Amino acid sequence: MFSKLSTRGIATRIGYLAQKAASQETAAPAAGSLSETVFARENKYGAHNYHPLPVALSKGEGVFVWDVEGKRYFDYLSAYSAVNQGHCHPKIVKALTEQASKLALTSRAFYSDVLGEYEEYVTKLFGFDKVLPMNTGVEGGETACKLARKWGYLQKKIPENQAKIIFARNNFWGRTLSAVSASNDPSSYEGFGPFMPGFELIEYDNVTALEEALKDPNVCAFMVEPIQGERGVVVPSDGYLKKVRELCSKNNVLWIADEVQTGLARTGKLLAVNYEDVQPDILILGKALSGGLYPVSAVLCNDPVMLCIKPGEHGSTYGGNPLGCRVAMAALEVLQEEKLAENAFKMGELLRSELSTLPKDVVSVVRGKGLLNAIVINEKYDAWKVCLKLKENGLLAKPTHGDIIRFAPPLVIMNPRLRESIEIIKKTILSM
């Protein structure tokens, strides 16, 4: 196992930055254009912690977004799977505007007439006793880790300050100090130490490594993504999640499923863990929980875990606010009413089938589930340049880890639009 407190070399980081800088050339917009003005203002007044594709968006509807010059694009990123229901879904917008005009925020110092309704709805939908409402995915991850540690001390009787949480290498769950402490990606952790103690890493999709790690009596939890999204849509072997469930139960260890990106119909099931018919001890949801209209996340588990947390030990000013709760219920209703999991499954099969016909000397790998997919580009073609060309042709996607391009359109995309977007991808790849 690899601990985040071990020494890490700077050489990896330098090599990473050099490679990134060399590959990320930006196609300049027309001089004096409105887009150029937008880029310049952000560059002047904003932190330089992102390297966006050079497009300035001003409108979204369904599977499309428009830039400030009025050009329309297919959105094949979906805000990292936050916009599963499509941009500005009318039902979710209606829920937001109606609740915003009544009551938006109370804090948890008082009850509201919406929170309990939401809590009942979401716990019954996913089959848990309790939910702890938060705002962002990374807050959900932090909450899950706190719950696991608290349970470890109170229920498993781990000695004070000795609890360990195991993570899979190449995970991604955010940018807080806890999240980067669980990362082995230099671009996430370099320069931010010292790191969180009690976090250890094992290989993803490696049952033997997990079995060995869980023998440690001080391990309280194993946190893992059912599919590693940010890594480039890495799908584990069939049966991996069943073994995770089996080993965690055998060793009295909590299984935390990070479904912030994979959950809520994205992979063709309501949850990605549903493919193996298993339930985690702690479930983290976020992103599409609000349909992209408001930051909402949730941590679900049963009473023996959730009731370890007492008043004053965890909370959030905005978590569980009436506006977020109303939006989340509408977003979840859309997933079910429009059968978006079923659509994601069917459209994903078609998308991967068509992508698999692309020349292997350009696209070496096609992988994914539902509408969470990725292609691996031969290094000599440069994935960043491919994305710039896709943009020119009317489709927005973003590379990850150098040679991987994620394809994850909103789940409302139907056959004709999907085929139209596939033609853009084919045209682009064949022109490289």
Curated annotation (Swiss-Prot):
Enzyme class (EC, first level): transferase
Subcellular location: Mitochondrion matrix
CDD domains: OAT_like
GO cellular component, one term: mitochondrial matrix
Reaction(s) the record says it catalyses: a 2-oxocarboxylate + L-ornithine = L-glutamate 5-semialdehyde + an L-alpha-amino acid
Highest taxon above the source species: Eukaryota
The protein, known as: Ornithine aminotransferase, mitochondrial
